[in-house]
């Protein structure tokens, strides 16, 4: 039962991360698009509710509750007898069934249909200041610091500020290749 609880906690973490990554479209992170499985919110037309991640978190809560009941059942044993074994078995088997069904549903109706929100991801990549580290080998630390400070103060991208500072486009393309940063060994 403890191992099932660990699975439930892990699934909750994954489901909550997907809910946050899919939040939006304008006020959330909006890094991914979750499959639209039903009409959106009655108060917010166009919103995609993360129904499958929400189901997974509810199932996980039940499995965690079942684990607590099993634990209490285990406390009730006296010598070789424990009249709580039927309840413990029911909750254990119930948790197995719930997790199996929720995992299958999660994979088929949510995870398999996730799409990256490329426009948002590219905008985030262009606006991140942490990419200034990639400029160091090309223009040096001090100059990279000047560029990142100006980008932070002005709200502009590193590329824009660096271009205005006279760094050529070829150098910027080489330094600020986000796909290469994400997969430095080409994998």
What are these regions (language model features)?
Residues 1-17, 89:
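Helix-rich catalytic cores of soluble enzyme domains
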Residues 16, 23-187:
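Catalytic-core signal marking the mid-to-C-terminal active-site face
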């Amino acid at each position: 039962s403890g191992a099932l609880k660990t699975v439930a906690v892990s699934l909750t973490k994954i489901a909550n991360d997907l809910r946050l990554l899919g939040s939006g479209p304008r006020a959330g992170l909006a890094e991914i698009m979750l499959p639209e499985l039903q009409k959106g919110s009655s108060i917010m037309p166009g919103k995609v509710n993360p129904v499958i991640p929400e189901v997974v978190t509810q199932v996980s809560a039940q499995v965690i509750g079942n684990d607590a009941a099993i634990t209490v059942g285990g406390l009730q044993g006296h010598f070789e007898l424990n009249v709580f074994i039927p309840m413990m078995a029911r909750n254990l088997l119930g948790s197995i069934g719930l997790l199996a069904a929720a995992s299958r549903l999660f994979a088929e109706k949510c995870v398999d249909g996730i799409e990256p929100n490329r426009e948002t991801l590219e905008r985030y990549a262009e606006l991140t200041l942490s990419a200034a580290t990639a400029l160091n080998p090309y223009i040096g630390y001090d100059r990279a610091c000047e560029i990142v400070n100006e980008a932070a103060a002005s709200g502009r991208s590193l590329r824009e500020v660096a271009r205005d500072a006279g760094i050529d486009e070829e150098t910027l393309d080489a330094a600020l290749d986000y796909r290469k940063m994400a997969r430095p060994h080409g994998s």
